């Protein structure tokens, strides 16, 4: 049993503690003040010190404001902060070719020296002619690792050095109403007899040779077993008003169309040399879309000079090209206008690299059929040279190319010979071919064969400068409607 004295002393001690306000335990807040570690930055004395990078951000995680306090410059703070948050993106030296790297949040930026560009300073890829035609509207030529743009006759180069601006009311190569519509086609036309021919290109000079119509007085008979000596549009669709403004039609003394042509200028029409054997005398009609109905746009012109290529080979149709100079100028209007002549290199690298060209004419609508009374047009794909040569039983020279389909029943045919093959580039149409020959019309596995105009651009330009030979200089006297015939030896 407890001693009564002890109990009295214990009670007195407890009473004393209560009266003094002391406690064995301390409050939670007081305990936290004792146990918690005081942060350096929150210390009264520390706040009075200038920011220190090691103290602020290396020993502990810091905020952007604390880093800014250290650097006292926002740009330097950003450079530090980008590395501090997600590491240095420039550590691996991603900028090539002496480029300078600048780190960012989850990214980096390269400042490149001249001649390099891109995210990592790759060598500059010049926008030369092979890439989007160098940005040129029309002709593109590469010079000193840059491009030089130029334009066809009747256009001027814009201030940006790229665009071509028309300087004429009716510029070449423009369709002023409607649009070309695609139509399947198989190109083939009249077939020449079997005989080899030279494969060569030409830019020869012009010299006066034959008397007027000497050649035309003795037309060469069509090759044996040839379904035509002219060429046509099989399939295709009607040319709407203004869609084929460069189409010309050669008409004989009976006012019947027998060959086509391409308007080059107000005085000049391009056609096939073999067409000169189809009539003793002929005129040129333009603006005609329906041979049975007058629409008020038609014009008929007498021919003053015929410039036939002197190397034309009747047996193979090689060098199948001629230029006609008219006695009176063509009146251009919305549905009568020239096609553009291209530059040689550009024509071969750009125009003939397009998928398709356009052929038009009044030829037969099927092999051995009747001539069309309405002007037809047909879109035909270019055919690679190997396929072209394999498809033909005859020689395909360097002055020829193929176009058309090998299985679709569409092609140029008898009556279309000499007519235009044009290629569209950025809404301007350029002369790329002359309808020349084919094995039948739209036969399976056969294509239409065209004179390759790019081989004769210099020759065409010289021919367009030719003038009529005075009667006294001619070996004979031409009739009132007989043109002077010139040749063009190489």
From Swiss-Prot:
Enzyme category, top tier: hydrolase
Domain EGF-like residues, every copy: 86-122, 125-165
Span of domain Gla: 41-85
Glycosylation sites: 61, 187, 205
Signal peptide feature range: 1-20
Keyword Repeat: yes
EC number(s) recorded for this UniProt protein: 3.4.21.6
Biased composition (Polar residues): 203-212
Region feature (Disordered): 183-230
Reactions performed catalytically: Selective cleavage of Arg-|-Thr and then Arg-|-Ile bonds in prothrombin to form thrombin
GO molecular function: calcium ion binding; serine-type endopeptidase activity
Keyword Nucleus: no
Propeptide stretch(es), residue numbers: 21-40, 184-232
PTM note: The vitamin K-dependent, enzymatic carboxylation of some glutamate residues allows the modified protein to bind calcium.
Subcellular location: Secreted
4-carboxyglutamate: residues carrying this PTM: 46-47, 54, 56, 59-60, 65-66, 69, 72, 75, 79
PROSITE patterns, A to Z: ASX_HYDROXYL, EGF_1, EGF_2, EGF_3, EGF_CA, GLA_1, GLA_2, TRYPSIN_DOM
Origin: domain of life: Eukaryota
Regulation: Inhibited by SERPINA5.
Function: Factor Xa is a vitamin K-dependent glycoprotein that converts prothrombin to thrombin in the presence of factor Va, calcium and phospholipid during blood clotting. Factor Xa activates pro-inflammatory signaling pathways in a protease-activated receptor (PAR)-dependent manner.
Remaining remarks: Calcium also binds, with stronger affinity to another site, beyond the GLA domain.
Protein name (Swiss-Prot/TrEMBL): Coagulation factor X
